[in-house]
């Protein structure tokens, strides 16, 4: 219709006005018919922008990754400067160190924005780690070191367990996070409750507010669009917010962790978020949006929760897992980490004792070196590093500081500390000293490196092919001793014909002479058969369906894979040898792909542990290899080690009182256990082979997920090429699980006594003794006290005793960061009530102090000289997502 002259003349809309009008109409249409919450209209949305990298390297080196991270966070900081409506959260100490190193002039600005509450230092931990693969003490140190760093550098303590990229959350996280004094636990995957806010509860009863709102980088159109959002895009955004209504507890606003996918930058449209909010405000939805920090959201819900106006569900136990390839691959990084963390904990213990009880020479507690070692272990807990899921340049690089460098630095530090501390405690001589870092009397089989041609006086011992000595010395709890050497070699095991039955104090075992499989294992005590089919059969498998996703990230469970070969397909050459300590059975043959396979099984005359070592060579690409142990009896319950405890779930028959997750591929720390319906059970121990799965009566241990490349980059540690030596162990028991001492046996398998050469023969001396229901994970010096940390290990409430046999004054129980809970009267023996899997921290005052250490703000002192140039290389244009590879070496 032609416009009437009487109608007012309207000027044409410019583009932004047109977009705003269209947006308003779209939002209005989108909310028609949407249910109103409590009759008050749609709930407010808190958008929390964040940047999510793999800060120690994923698709590039450590040195280059930190440039990406620094520049990307500065991109967010620029938007805070330029737009009064923008806010974001910043995570990981090493990212701030990168900003300090490359653009130190921006640090005052960052501190200003933190004070203005437009930037929040959100993560209490030193970095965003995988929480499922380290020991408990390493995970706690990650939090302690992070909190101390922020307090020293920024004068504040972050309030959150920011775990947005973990791939499953274990049962002890509520206790660890609350023990660190944190207000809430945040993760995004495998939320089983159906609500975005709930209480998470650990086995000891500790609970923490938990936020699991969806993905960690949602509402992506706001950030990734190159133009103002049009009506259709805004309509989709409105529907996305609507979808959050049903999963957000009634009465609570909506939380969205916002960004444009991994490595998210500030919105590409420079006028966002202000212009976006203007667009949104002209719509008719009535839904308010605020770009906020996490604390602004938590501050909004906490009073309402406390007043009972927001009802929350409760989750006991952990969650399911995903990205399951992470638990089964790159044994090199996982075993190195395990070895180093146990060595570091032992070094702290012996150094503590030596600094207080040295008799041969004075010993100063090496506080700086041990602190530095923990900082480097924190870096190697970075998610993609410890998962083993990254380009090879993250692990070994000729140009850049890498994970191997950090492992080597920690190894050197712990060896030097153990040697010097041990020598200050024990008199010089021509014998050897031993230090047992475990808090119980032990007599497990161990391998010792002794001077050539010697053995231990008065103790059965046998010579191993690698030149070490196999023996079983008895040692007291957390003790030192000096043992006399016999100047004659240990016995060489006698090669014999493989007997029909191998008999030890604990087992009757039979091996297949053709395949090398363990075909029968009977309890000596009950004559009960433990195996339902040949065991320690090594099986090669591949996914049944062609995978679209990267197999170094995703791996289906065993029922969705095809068996392509096994160690029983080809004949094996068998060898049996009997020594004074053990039977050793070896089977050699050819495996899938044509590579050699060597299996060694060691059955000890006087130990229930059976040790295995499987060597694989040149495993073909895209192949999963497992060791299977089919059992003869139904499995009633499954337990598996997690940081500072264990997960406990039902198997054959559901049990609502057991909350542990048991299905599919799961991560394990040190041990998994399968309790039989009729009593007794079977456990698998590991030194870093962290993947387990059980189907029916058959547990499997994952050995290799062979992938030559990771997203286009070669990775020698992930590849099946070359030689792979993979140790593991099993043990069975006839009685109840709480008496079987499986956690203690797993610690023994992972931490042999420390050898101190060139010492005199001395009586054994114990320094800490405890009841058998706790495991001491840490003993170190800090300031004017000794920190002693232990955990109840049976899963049962009771009483613990701790006898401390070195001088100290006042004592108190603290939380994980050393804040006093209550004083304890000083005594030689402490008796404490403990809850199931409770973590207990004691501080024992000393008459002398060790220095309080400054915060780490540079990596140069740790980096090999030839790699310092790469550490300092800076390119201001690098930000956002590093590129994927093309099959070439980085």
Predicted feature locations:
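N-terminal catalytic cores of secreted or lumenal carbohydrate-active enzymes
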Residues: 38-141, 150
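Boundary at the C-terminal end of the N-terminal hydrophobic targeting segment
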Residues: 33-37
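Acidic, His- and aromatic-enriched active-site or binding-groove loops in soluble protein domains
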Residues: 107-121, 178-193, 203-206
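C-terminal (or distal) subdomains of carbohydrate-active enzymes
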Residues: 173-176, 212, 224-233, 241, ...
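CE4/NodB-like, metal-dependent polysaccharide N-deacetylase domain
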Residues: 139-172, 176-179, 236-258
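N-terminal secretory signal peptides and thylakoid transit peptides that target proteins
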Residues: 4-25
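Catalytic grooves of carbohydrate-active enzymes
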Residues: 47, 52-58, 152, 208, ...
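Alpha-helical scaffolding within the catalytic cores
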Residues: 75, 102-113, 192-200, 230-244
